[in-house]
Amino acid sequence: MSAEQRKKKKTTTTTQGRGAEVAMADEDGGRLRAAAETTGGPGSPDPADGPPPTPNPDRRPAARPGFGWHGGPEENEDEADDAAADADADEAAPASGEAVDEPAADGVVSPRQLALLASMVDEAVRTIPSPPPERDGAQEEAARSPSPPRTPSMRADYGEENDDDDDDDDDDDRDAGRWVRGPETTSAVRGAYPDPMASLSPRPPAPRRHHHHHHHRRRRAPRRRSAASDSSKSGSSSSASSASSSASSSSSASASSSDDDDDDDAARAPASAADHAAGGTLGADDEEAGVPARAPGAAPRPSPPRAEPAPARTPAATAGRLERRRARAAVAGRDATGRFTAGRPRRVELDADAASGAFYARYRDGYVSGEPWPGAGPPPPGRVLYGGLGDSRPGLWGAPEAEEARARFEASGAPAPVWAPELGDAAQQYALITRLLYTPDAEAMGWLQNPRVAPGDVALDQACFRISGAARNSSSFISGSVARAVPHLGYAMAAGRFGWGLAHVAAAVAMSRRYDRAQKGFLLTSLRRAYAPLLARENAALTGARTPDDGGDANRHDGDDARGKPAAAAAPLPSAAASPADERAVPAGYGAAGVLAALGRLSAAPASAPAGADDDDDDDGAGGGGGGRRAEAGRVAVECLAACRGILEALAEGFDGDLAAVPGLAGARPAAPPRPGPAGAAAPPHADAPRLRAWLRELRFVRDALVLMRLRGDLRVAGGSEAAVAAVRAVSLVAGALGPALPRSPRLLSSAAAAAADLLFQNQSLRPLLADTVAAADSLAAPASAPREARKRKSPAPARAPPGGAPRPPKKSRADAPRPAAAPPAGAAPPAPPTPPPRPPRPAALTRRPAEGPDPQGGWRRQPPGPSHTPAPSAAALEAYCAPRAVAELTDHPLFPAPWRPALMFDPRALASLAARCAAPPPGGAPAAFGPLRASGPLRRAAAWMRQVPDPEDVRVVILYSPLPGEDLAAGRAGGGPPPEWSAERGGLSCLLAALGNRLCGPATAAWAGNWTGAPDVSALGAQGVLLLSTRDLAFAGAVEFLGLLAGACDRRLIVVNAVRAADWPADGPVVSRQHAYLACEVLPAVQCAVRWPAARDLRRTVLASGRVFGPGVFARVEAAHARLYPDAPPLRLCRGANVRYRVRTRFGPDTLVPMSPREYRRAVLPALDGRAAASGAGDAMAPGAPDFCEDEAHSHRACARWGLGAPLRPVYVALGRDAVRGGPAELRGPRREFCARALLEPDGDAPPLVLRDDADAGPPPQIRWASAAGRAGTVLAAAGGGVEVVGTAAGLATPPRREPVDMDAELEDDDDGLFGE
């Protein structure tokens, strides 16, 4: 119908339905208004009044759920109708200019009704957009909508004064009524919004109305105030009311700012027109836009005129404003762009799973307790959380109100009735309120609704309000908490404590006026039962305690065991996805919110300055200055590409290998490279090493989180879809920044996911690849496929996981794909060859430990009893469990020696990583839960430690270490990764092996991992029962605990040397019982004087010995403990040159094992001894002037023939106190320094370390004597930089006898300065 017909119909309905009330109001208007003023209006309903009526869509006041004049349903129909009539009369007065107090006769249209009709027509005329050239001030004011309540920051901008009225309901209602009426209130035209293109400036004060307008406002003000207060009360007290979702958008200060409305309301009229033309009735959108309804075939409405363009805003301000709008959209009842929306319920399937409870037992959302909610975080320094998401106010620390309230709160032991962040930790208040809610007969709901407050509490509340910058204390704007006793919700969101939501939900129920006392008691009992399992899991995870009753329902004893039986029958029990109680099996942060946070950190990583403009002290490593940084950036960029491949492979595994089903991947494109900031020139992304390292850290975090989410079945739920989209976005961002600079990889990629990552880095579309993968899946799954019409995929559903955990349908692609678990249409005949059922989801390796106890053959952490040297693992690590059948399948592989397989059984994390590397189980109902294990190169290297010592019972000493990036004991550089970066501050595997081999380690020596071409040979250590275990090795924690329990079972003690820094100790690391010998130390390259004091050339072969650094001091203690614990075993020989041999590139080939024995050298060099040595590869070493030692390693022919190729000179160890070391090389003087400068210890694989403790040990320095009468008498030493030095010119016929080693046990007894002590 047309606009006028609709309004006439409304007028007729209003006249017929409200004739008696209107007539009575006209005849006895003064008496009714006096009664309304006396009783307070509809805010105080009579006990005899019934429930609120259902809103009639044909009545104007109720047909505007989103307009904002009436925030909730009326509590009394008569009073509501009277208030609506008053509102209509108020708006009719400016249009008609006639009095409205004339009586109306029965059956005759009264002047009052004519005035109402005239106001409607006038409103319709004024809401039709017209392009006048200019408008005067009165028309501009008339076109403005009433200003809704504003946020504290807006009020501060408007310059309003703060009133010090108390924060009671009357003040709130008065303020709400004032803002509903408008500033200084004028009755503005309904539906008229500011021009969307107008500038966002504060509105000028409204002009005063004429005298008779004020007269009508005074006569109608009390009743309008009552209606407005009722709407504000109902809208704030009950968020579930029929009109609260839209009314709160007009009454909520955080959701209705002029900035938001100016940008978004322009699209309402077209959207409403489209909805109405499609057959819909006039809804909130049409009324909101202020455009009358029109017939389906009517012409489209004219577009509003374009005003002057708004001034340009900064991108940061625009982005922040849009983000705030999105955050407030859920509260305001708007969509993601800020437009008002009316929620349409979707079709809900109530199947047997939902009725039995199995559907709810399988519920997962992808989020992990303990990880911050996306967008939540701590407030800026000096501020506390206040208002909406991301808002804050200045802190009140030191204010007398806050200090007094804090002292009172700490002394009371009860929850504070008015809580502020200045009182202390929010966790304490949350814990007190939660415990109060579970205390019977405590009247918790009554306390939340109306707590007894002291004068100091009122003073604190007023002080917090004043410092927030708000002008008036309104009950409508977002404060983050519905009750003053409950802390701001942002603290629960930042901590990831979903259990803290109980206080807010209970307070919302307590503050509601829609329930009586008995109903609130029922709701509180419901909340207690619902939150009890969640609180039990979260609190147990925090305290490390076992969750009682498996985290199940706390009320299972009262006969509702039906909760478990049907669920157990319908859900697969071994799967982790079937049990929502095991969410803490994943570390905090490794969930959907953690992936989103990692994407935010990756996007916000700052750019660094170019290499040339940076500090110039980087040239002490391998390569100098900018060249070294560029080389490092290239290596890190390659690692970023590998991490991106890992992310897409994890996503592909999570969606059963179907890349087309990964959310967001079909339309993924490389993001534009980040632009340099305004600070100045920045290094390009591919050369920015610090930012690349930050990116690599976040990419690896995302990869690990996705793997854990896949193992738990969290990728196919709502939060998993968000995490997948965020992961694809992270890959796209890195691909756009690094793709143009990375070389093209010529090798064949092992998976389609890796190929997808490379296509992104090459700025190519993924659709052909996705089409190929879908086509390949079709050819494998359905050889005789159904007709094309039966398999056509056309689904407009959003990227959301299907219900019930069904496999995700593929995205749009150019090839067809079968719809998973889709039934054929009702009228279509099924195809002749039935298609096989979809492949079941991959089983999860880890579940929760069973309540009856773990199986001895299962996979779980065997924490040793009693006290321990290392920290205990978390409760989640102790609860992780792998079924015995899965353990047997995963460990039955020739890669794992049978004696070492129990170490895998002791480490559920290792079993989960093996399950992730398994292929999908073969179709056809095979008994195996996992497919064959893919024994890749990284897995082989991670499991190579099992072959150091064949039998676990032969292990006597375990050395734990943390390698540098790029160091690998199992492969050296054969793994293909980037070379390690030399560091003088932190030592890794290279320095550890050099100390065990009694030699120095430098960037140009064979001991440095950057020069390795293969895995070092440590078989000599394994033969002594010494096991080297890296924190990156497979089952690191399980191996240590297995060896400890095995030694305890054999009634012996294990010796554990922990050379891992505390910062590098892995989360949930191994537990070492105190019954074993334990020595903690560090690996420091700076103990070498050549690294610590490079200017002291006379000390370049000297090493500082200490009992806290991995070296001779620690070795002496280990050897003494070994001799005491194993008196019948051969003595340990830790610091010996024969312990370690390296594979490096030499003149005899790229994979030479050094130190090479003299016999091996002579056999290798024999072909060059036929007189043509100058033309051979050994010519430089056999030349007359060849240096004997290059970087302290045997090089010349005579040196190699005597000690072997690459045999190192032995260092001199000097024991200095800490104060002397801090004093510099000048502290080492006298005979010991002379000894260190002249001593030249010849290579000897069996010689013990030479330690100088004091000057008495410094005898005549040993020298190398050459027995050749025709050759050189001195020893020529060459450095990598080209310097040559000749030492020992005195000739001799034989080498003097070796100096006797120092008795280390005697030195330990005299260690008075703690160098070798505990």
Curated annotation (Swiss-Prot):
Primary localization class, coarse: host cell
This protein's domain notes: The N-terminal and C-terminal domains are required for the transcriptional activation function of ICP4.
Listed Acidic residues bias regions: 74-91, 159-174, 1303-1318
Record family assignment: Belongs to the herpesviridae ICP4 family.
Domain of life according to the entry: Viruses
GO cellular component, one term: host cell nucleus
Function: Plays an essential role in the regulation of viral gene expression by both activating and repressing host RNA polymerase II-mediated transcription. Binds with high affinity to the sequence 5'-ATCGTC-3'. Activates transcription by recruiting a form of the host TFIID to promoters and stabilizing the pre-initiation complex formation. Negatively regulates its own transcription. This immediate early (IE) protein is absolutely necessary for the transition from IE transcription to later viral gene transcription.
Record localization: Host nucleus; Host cytoplasm; Virion tegument
Post-translational events: ADP-ribosylated.
Pfam families, sorted: Herpes_ICP4_C, Herpes_ICP4_N
Biased composition range(s): Pro residues: 44-56, 299-308, 799-808, 821-843
Positions of region (Disordered): 1-108, 123-324, 542-580, 606-630, 780-873, 1291-1318
Keyword flag Phosphoprotein: yes
Keywords: Activator, ADP-ribosylation, DNA-binding, Early protein, Host cytoplasm, Host nucleus, Phosphoprotein, Transcription, Transcription regulation, Virion, Virion tegument
Biological processes per GO annotation: DNA-templated viral transcription; positive regulation of DNA-templated transcription
UniProt-recorded name of the protein: Major viral transcription factor ICP4 homolog
Feature: compositional bias, Basic and acidic residues: 133-143, 547-564
Self-association state and partner proteins as the record states: Homodimer. Interacts with transcriptional regulator ICP27; this interaction is required for proper incorporation of ICP4 into virions. Interacts with host TBP; theis interaction helps the stabilization of the pre-initiation complex on specific promoters. Interacts with host GTF2B.
Molecular function in Gene Ontology: DNA binding
Biased composition (Basic residues): 1-11, 206-226
Compositional bias per record (Low complexity), positions renumbered to this chain: 228-257, 268-278, 309-320, 566-580, 844-863
DNA-binding region: 319-547
